[in-house]
């Protein structure tokens, strides 16, 4: 996978003060990907060292009062060309910088105060549809023994649990909030495994319960809360869905957004709020753009076809009618299923980083679809899904 990274984050002395800002998590990522080092400020010909610069009223000013807007724009376009000419889809830039800041930058008073805004290079990259994050994202998404990656698996995908080198197993009946009387459906197992996959600390949940079985939204999302209690900051959902014809096709996909059509919400139940600071959760970028970009990069490297689209969560358990499929198509929905939606809401409320992979096992509303046929289709893509998950974990 190709990634553009701010040179200062890799230890190069290109900052205004002649120093660098090396970040170990970024350097660790750089060892696993094909890196293009960029620094729009030195690319423009600005010297090192130089006075600090900040944006103010749409211009870039040095602390000595010099207007260096044109220099920053020139350097940003040079860096942009280096990124686009190499077909790079991910850039890791220095936070708060007047050239590389993402969503916040210094306000131009040289007082350390931050305001909403983008660096000069960041603006150009975003206009090109490139995923741009700062070193803070990389640090936050770095798994450890204290912060393992959670994987919650759906129908026919529980085989991923077999990849784990186990350290401990947990019966779902011992998980707070999980219904003790629940029995796993075909293709599910109710025993979590803590361990590692290729050396990456993980907690794998190879089964779940659903609303249509009569369980509450809080019970349906209890595994997410348990993962959070175990220290998980990153969570990967993988489940079978139906592909809405015209918007998606069968096979593997990554979910970019969702519509909750279940008629309920875990944050509307007292039991679902026990670990949540506020029920008023921002659902913009609910599915981490960074993790989605990693998944697409891994898929490209491994020659795995990976589609993407919006997911609609329904109550179920019946499969969709033709009229429902037509409605979902008009809504811009690509995938439809009976899990994931509530779990994503809970994960976001707990400030977890979410990646949702889907196996579109059948065309939504197709004749002859059964639970067994979904399981059989899942087996067809099992190897590619395994390679994809292992590839993503390897980049975290």
Model-inferred region functions:
Residues 364-396:
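His/Asp/Glu-rich mid-to-C-terminal helical/loop segments that flank catalytic regions of hydrolases
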Residues 338-374:
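Zn-dependent metallopeptidase/amidohydrolase metal-coordination segment
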Residues 8-13, 60-68, 106, 201-215, ...:
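Short, basic, glycine/proline-bearing loop/turn elements
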Residues 21-62:
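Short, surface-exposed acidic-centric catalytic microdomains
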Residues 58, 141-283:
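Metabolite-binding pocket within alpha/beta catalytic cores that recognizes anionic/polar moieties
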Residues 19-36, 118-122, 165-186:
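Short catalytic helix/loop segments, enriched in acidic residues and glycine
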Residues 43, 52-78, 82, 113-141, ...:
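Divalent-metal-activated hydrolytic enzyme cores
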Residues 99-100, 107-124, 128, 190-200, ...:
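Mid-sequence, gly/pro-rich, charge-dense loop/helix-turn segments that line enzyme active sites
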């Amino acid at each position: 996978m190709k990634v553009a990274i701010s040179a200062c984050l890799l230890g190069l002395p290109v900052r205004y003060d002649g120093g660098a800002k090396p970040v170990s998590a970024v350097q660790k990522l750089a060892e696993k990907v094909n890196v293009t080092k960029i620094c729009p400020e030195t690319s423009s010909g600005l010297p090192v060292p130089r006075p600090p610069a900040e944006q103010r009223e749409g211009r870039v000013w040095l602390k000595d009062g010099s207007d260096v807007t044109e220099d920053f724009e020139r350097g940003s376009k040079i860096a942009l060309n280096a990124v686009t000419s190499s077909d790079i889809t991910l850039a890791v830039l220095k936070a708060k910088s007047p050239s590389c800041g993402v969503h916040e930058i210094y306000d131009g008073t040289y007082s350390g105060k931050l305001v909403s805004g983008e660096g000069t290079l960041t603006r150009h990259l975003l206009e090109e549809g490139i995923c741009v994050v700062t070193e803070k994202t990389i640090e936050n998404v770095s798994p450890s023994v204290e912060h393992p990656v959670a994987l919650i698996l759906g129908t026919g995908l529980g085989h991923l649990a077999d990849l784990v080198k186990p350290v401990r197993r947990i019966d779902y009946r011992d998980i707070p909030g999980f219904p003790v009387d629940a029995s796993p459906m075909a293709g599910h197992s109710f025993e979590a495994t803590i361990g590692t996959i290729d050396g990456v600390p993980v907690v794998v949940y190879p089964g779940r319960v659903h609303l249509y079985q009569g369980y509450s939204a809080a019970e349906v999302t209890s595994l997410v809360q348990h993962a959070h209690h175990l220290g998980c900051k990153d969570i990967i959902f993988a489940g079978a869905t139906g592909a809405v014809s015209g918007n998606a096709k069968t096979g593997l996909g990554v979910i970019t957004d969702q519509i909750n059509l279940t008629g309920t919400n875990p944050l509307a139940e007292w039991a679902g709020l026990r670990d949540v600071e506020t029920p008023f959760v921002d659902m913009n970028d609910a599915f981490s753009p960074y993790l989605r970009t990693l998944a697409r990069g891994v898929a490209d490297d491994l020659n795995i076809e990976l589609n993407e689209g919006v997911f609609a969560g329904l109550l179920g358990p019946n499969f969709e009618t033709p009229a429902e499929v037509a409605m979902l198509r008009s809504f811009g929905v690509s995938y439809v299923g009976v899990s994931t939606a509530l779990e994503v809401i809970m994960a976001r409320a707990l400030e977890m980083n979410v990646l949702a992979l889907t196996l579109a096992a059948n065309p939504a509303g197709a004749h002859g679809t059964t639970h067994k046929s979904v399981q059989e289709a899942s087996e067809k893509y099992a190897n590619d899904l395994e390679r994809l998950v292992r590839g993503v974990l390897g980049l975290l």
